[in-house]
Amino acid sequence: MAELPLAPLKRILKRAGGERVSDDAVEALRDEVEDRALEMAQRAREYAKHADRKTVQREDVMAARREH
């Protein structure tokens, strides 16, 4: 999978208080974020499909977010 770049995720971990952050930690966060994003995207697609749309809109993503 590995779609997201590591550098921004490392910055997020540091901003959260991680003085030093291992590469393994960054990769683990990337994997988790990608998994959750894919799940949310799939739910958002279902909301769009239910509304007889092919285009996933912001409201679909927000509905999927509330569901989680």
Regions found by a protein language model. Give the residues of each.
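Terminal helix-to-tail segments of small alpha-helical proteins
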Residues: 1-68
